[in-house]
């Protein structure tokens, strides 16, 4: 078993626990010595804090990674009430790249599909279905039927 929890299921009640998550790198942000990634799986996403610049600098969007770390409360003022995992973050102690991704034909984390032709979306359907709206539609369809 790779993971102990799903990314979207982590809450404040998990603070202090060491967990292992597996998922895709949705976004990476570097802030002088510390990097933040949004780790996404089918259940949602969670912010991961990486102190090792060398490791974080190599990560790219849609790389599949395995992260082990401790759930901590976000510093005051950095909470994000618009997402369920906005109170917490995972302080990474170990990161393993499971699979690298080729350069993407379009951004997966953006909701804007106006600049992406239908032909490209169909050709790369496996990427298109990772986007929030199509994934939500499939989930709803699965629940209804």
Located regions from the model:
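Class II aminoacyl-tRNA synthetase catalytic cores and aaRS-like
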Residues: 1-145
């Amino acid at each position: 078993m790779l993971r102990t929890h799903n990314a979207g299921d982590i809450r404040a009640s998990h603070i202090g626990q060491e967990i292992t998550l597996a998922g895709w790198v949705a976004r990476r942000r570097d802030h002088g010595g510390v990097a933040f990634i949004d780790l996404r799986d089918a259940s949602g996403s969670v912010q991961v804090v990486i102190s090792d610049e060398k490791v974080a600098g190599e990560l790219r969007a849609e790389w599949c990674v395995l992260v082990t770390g401790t759930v901590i409360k976000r510093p005051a003022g950095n909470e994000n009430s618009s997402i369920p995992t906005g109170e917490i973050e995972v302080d990474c102690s170990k990161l393993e790249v499971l699979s690298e991704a080729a350069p993407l034909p379009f951004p997966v984390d953006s909701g804007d599909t106006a600049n992406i032709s239908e032909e490209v979306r169909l050709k790369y359907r496996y990427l298109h279905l990772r986007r929030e709206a199509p994934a939500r539609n499939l989930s709803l369809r699965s629940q209804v039927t």
